[in-house]
Amino acid sequence: MCIRDSADTARAILEICLSKNPGNELAIMTLAGLHAFAGDRSHIEALAHDGFADDPIIRSIEWILSRNEMPQVHFSRWSMFDTALAAAERSRAFYEFGVWMGDSFRYLIDYFPQGYGFDTFEGLPEEWHGLPRGSYTSFGEVPNILGAEFVVGEFRDTLPEFFAHERPMAGLINFDADLYSRPSRR
């Protein structure tokens, strides 16, 4: 297994978080997952024993641990992007679903001839994990990035029309949407 950047830094940050808020379940599960990826499954097993066995995070960690080949673990999106770029077909277009302020898009577009970004640019359409509606808004401002074409609106409204026409094959897809909403029946 390859752990990119600093597992020690991630562990220290999680421990600080838990010293301030010992009941933070996400931090507890993330720290347990970090220990498990490093070879110590005791924290995951304790959480499963304490009633978290069916939690989606614990189930996801267990599934990953059950694989024959462990994935790389990254502690920054930039490290993850560099790994993805090494495997990407850079002569093709890049697609990003969930653009927000465009930081990831700006980083990735430098490696591709064309980029397409999809977002409402209005933030979360509903409350999500304690974040209020409108969090992650760019206040309707669409980034101005050379080589980019942005499609503004909800995926369920914009993707069918966009992909009804021939589009370049993807060399890389970055899916960074926070919500999955089923399309409404029309």
Language-model features, listed with the residues they occupy:
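TPR-repeat structural position
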Residues: 6-8, 41
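S-adenosylmethionine/decaboxylated-SAM
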Residues: 16, 65-67, 86-186
